[in-house]
Structure formats: structure tokens, C-alpha cells
Amino acid sequence: LRCLVQYYADFVFKENEKLAETLKDIIDTPVSPELLPPDKDGKIAQKTENTVGSYILHDFFLYNCVRNGFSPEKIYFLAKIAVKQKNLEPFSDETIKNTLKIFYKRFFGQQFKRSCMPDGVKVGTVSLSPRGDWRMPSDSSVALWLKQVENLK
């Protein structure tokens, strides 16, 4: 939900100039696991978005999977329509499909982390807290969802 937080921060930029500079610096920093040291120019050498695909797509998939309970087919269909909107980046159908596959693999594969997550705030209408909105076994299999993604046309 990084994209949603960016929109909230943009609102704060307009309302509080003192916070704006600090928040802008934080938001403009690319998400990175920081496993690799910075390059010779001091720039981040490893950017997660380059590996997993667009965060815009991942946020779209997450919202429609968790909040709406949509199937991979419906999410793919809606994503193809949504990216045609003038305010979104253009993504090919193949890019959407590949990113959806990565999303499901990571979503299921990382469930164990959510099962023991610390308390935190809820931003928006979607929460993955195991104490509230989201309950999913850590050993769930992604096979059914990946099969649906593979069959997308």
C-alpha cells in the first residue's frame, strides 16, 4: 500500500510545509532490502521494484485480492482496463500477467511474516494483520492461483 501512503503524504505536503521536505525525502527513496552496498556514486544498487515489478500493479492486485476477494482472472481483467486510464503507466498484458504471477508467489510465500507481525496502524481499508482483517495459514499453497494465472488470455 506504498502508493496509497504516497497520496496521503502529498496531502500533508500541502497542509504542513515543515513536514513536507522530510516526508518527500522518505517517499522518494526507492524501496530496497539494502542487501547490497551503494554503488561508487552512493546510489542504491538494488531496487526491489526492478525485481518484483511495478508497485502500482502490486497495490492494485493486493487491494482487489484482499479487499474484494477477486479471482486472478478478474484481477487481471480489471488491471488491463485500469492501465488504459490516462493517469496510469501503460503496461502490456504480458507484463500484467507476469507481475500477477510474482504477486501471488510472494503473497503466499511471505504469509509466515504476517503471522507474527507487530502491532501497527491501519492505512486505508485493507489490513494484513492476523489479529483483524486477514487470517491465512502460513503453509497455504499458491498452486491453484498460479494455475489460474497461467491460463489467463
Give, region by region, the residue ranges found by the protein language model.
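ATP/NTP-dependent adenylation/nucleotidyl-transfer catalytic domains that generate, transfer
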Residues: 1-153
